Amino acid sequence: MVPTRSTARMLANLKIRTGMFWVLSLFSLTLLFSTASAWWAALGSDQQITELDQTAHQSDRLNNALLMAIRSSANVSSGFIEQLGGHDESAGKRMALSVELNNKSQALVDEFVENAREPALRGLATELQATFAEYAKAVAGQREATRQRSLEQYFKVNSDAGNAMGRLQTLRQQLVTTLSERGQQIMLESDRRLARAQLLSLCLLGVTVVLAVLCWAFIAQRVLHPLREAGGHFRRIASGDLSVPVQGQGNNEIGQLFHELQRMQQSQRDTLGQINNCARQLDAAATALNAVTEESANNLRQQGQELEQAATAVTEMTTAVEEVARNAITTSQTTSESNQLAAQSRRQVSENIDGTEAMTREIQTSSAHLQQLVGQVRDIGKVLEVIRSVSEQTNLLALNAAIEAARAGEAGRGFAVVADEVRTLAYRTQQSTQEIEQMIGSVQAGTEAAVASMQASTNRAQSTLDVTLASGQVLEGIYSAIGEINERNLVIASAAEEQAQVAREVDRNLLNIRELSNHSAAGAQQTSEASKALSGLVGEMTALVGRFKV
């Protein structure tokens, strides 16, 4: 179908922004529909995965419940056998484990029934719960028969438990078959959902390809072709050719670009004419400026020579004043260092005094503790005397018991062995008591020697403290004298520094004036050179303007 003239005019005036808006809107709608479809498919898949997971959990709950129920009955049987063998403690543990397993299996069955919402599972789950209650009752009867040690009652309830377990196994098989069929049904539904999603994705892909082709055709016809034409105009303008006029194309963004390009071409033509006029005026002004700058440069050179002589004289005076200031500052610094050393010595003496006092107090405390230790050692010796007396009496009693056992003959042999062991223990206790008494005697002697040594250390520490206090008083006098010397040196250094500062300020001002004079001379020289360069640039500018084709 060939587009009519009105249609072509409409496309020429169609805003690129509007066209791109429609294209992007179609793409956005396609993307939105694709996203919604994918979201719907994902929700369906999530539901199916959840159902499969619940089905698997139901099978696990059912199998674990039956396994724990079987283990509960097995523990009761083991407990019954152990109780018959006289192992009551082990049988009790078996009974407790059976109760725990029965409670866990009951919880799993209740959870299975609660989650069995399908009609096909609901009836079987209810029957399973009732049958499990019968089985739990039979196992409880086994535990009761075990506690009563009734073999007849145990075999009776054991038969009931076996029958209930048989029905539970049959129900488990039916439930597992039903759950498996439900899982297969979910997988078939998932396959059908996947096929629908794939077909929908292919359709959306076809729509996207068609939209992409239409978008490319619009961009190639309404954007790329006009931009190539505009690029040709830009290349000609960049090369200096302004002779080819720019024609407008429509009222859209590309048309506005061509209108602005036309305005730029005309503006460059006007600018080139103005530049040509300005170049002639600059040539005349540069000649006059060159003469004025030559005269200014000569005057500034003479002024710089006179300032150089004045700056040299002030620099020599500044050097002398700074030497005086440095000597005063050096003296002040030396005095300050002496003051710091004196202060440091005073602090160290103060720390020595505090340390000596603390050491004296600690030695006195240690001496008191050692005195307490001596008393405690004496108390321990008294306790050991009592223990030794008790062991001697125990030895005598064991000897009497051995004699009585010997009189009893064969009937008292076991008692004689015990009496002999008691006598041996009493003998060992007596020997250990003697060894401890010897060690306590050594500790007591060492402690008394330590107390005497502590007392001597206390006396020496007190003497050291008195000497340190006297040294601190002497250092305090030295510190005060150094402080007065430091204050006087600071006054001298401050006065010398003020004089040096004034001299430096004068020297700096003269140097600044000389620097400004040099800068002015250099500026005049640069201005002269710039005026000459400006004359050359005027010629070059005229030549450049001549290169353009208007």
Curated annotation (Swiss-Prot):
Residues 278-514 form the Methyl-accepting transducer domain. This is Methyl-accepting chemotaxis protein PcaY. InterPro entries: Chemotax_Me-accpt_rcpt, HAMP_dom, MCPsignal_dom, Tar_rcpt_lig-bd. L-quinate binds at residues 71-78, 135, 142, 158. Keywords: Cell inner membrane, Cell membrane, Chemotaxis, Membrane, Methylation, Transducer, Transmembrane, Transmembrane helix. Chemotactic-signal transducers respond to changes in the concentration of attractants and repellents in the environment, transduce a signal from the outside to the inside of the cell, and facilitate sensory adaptation through the variation of the level of methylation. PcaY recognizes a wide range of compounds containing a C6-membered ring with a carboxylate group. Binds preferentially compounds that serve as carbon sources and among them those that rapidly promote growth. SMART domains: HAMP (SM00304), MA (SM00283). It comes from Pseudomonas putida (strain ATCC 47054 / DSM 6125 / CFBP 8728 / NCIMB 11950 / KT2440). Residues 41-198 are periplasmic. It comes from the Bacteria. Disruption phenotype: Disruption of the gene abolishes chemotaxis to benzoate, quinate, protocatechuate and shikimate. Inactivation of the gene does not alter competitive plant root colonization. Belongs to the methyl-accepting chemotaxis (MCP) protein family. Ligand free PcaY_PP-ligand-binding domain (LBD) is present in a monomer-dimer equilibrium. Only the dimeric LBD is able to bind ligands which in turn causes dimer stabilization. The chain crosses the membrane at residues 20-40, 199-219. Benzoate binds at residues 71, 75.
